[in-house]
Amino acid sequence: MAPKKAKRRAAAEGGSSSVFSMFDQTQIQEFKEAFTVIDQNRDGIIDKEDLRDTFAAMGRLNVKNEELDAMMKEASGPINFTVFLNMFGEKLKGADPEDVITGAFKVLDPEGKGTIKKKFLEELLTTQCDRFSQEEIKNMWAAFPPDVGGNVDYKNICYVITHGDAKDQE
């Protein structure tokens, strides 16, 4: 391991392992999968370039350095998996699950329209982490049909995930 990487990795070890008691094993595995997706260069540390590459993979090519710097400053040092888990633990304390899920979708909706493209969502769901089967995709589109423009209302999806039934259309 290069000295620079060793120094970064050693500095990242500062995260507390007690955060692992906040989540069950399934949740920890899901966070690990998300961490792995973001850690584009697979060095065990999320850095500014990993964030830039992750945004690029999602189609957002013009992320400003200031935005990336602000994200990196949310951590007190290098972001290894324990620090990543700690950050989510802090963010999720007392949070409404619907708000948390909606917040995750909002990352994919930089224009704040409340919708995301069907094609993009389908690509994410079939190529990242716990991949959807074609049958699961078909069932999802039956439950949450996109509009004529190919947009999916993610707020309705979030509501159903957290409440178990479709929200009445206003």
Curated annotation (Swiss-Prot):
Keywords: Calcium, Metal-binding, Methylation, Motor protein, Muscle protein, Myosin, Phosphoprotein, Repeat. One of its GO terms (molecular function) is structural constituent of muscle. InterPro entries: EF-hand-dom_pair, EF_Hand_1_Ca_BS, EF_hand_dom, Myosin_RLC. One of its GO terms (cellular component) is myosin complex. The modification Phosphothreonine is found at residues 26, 36, 102. This is Myosin regulatory light chain 2, skeletal muscle isoform. Plays a role in muscle contraction. PANTHER family: MYOSIN REGULATORY LIGHT CHAIN 2. The lineage of its organism: Eukaryota, Metazoa, Chordata, Craniata, Vertebrata. Ca(2+) binds at residues 39, 41, 43, 50. This chain binds calcium. Residues 26-61, 96-131, 132-167 form the EF-hand domain. SUPFAM superfamilies: EF-hand. The modification Phosphoserine is found at residues 16-17, 76. Myosin is a hexamer of 2 heavy chains and 4 light chains. The modification N,N,N-trimethylalanine is found at residue 2.
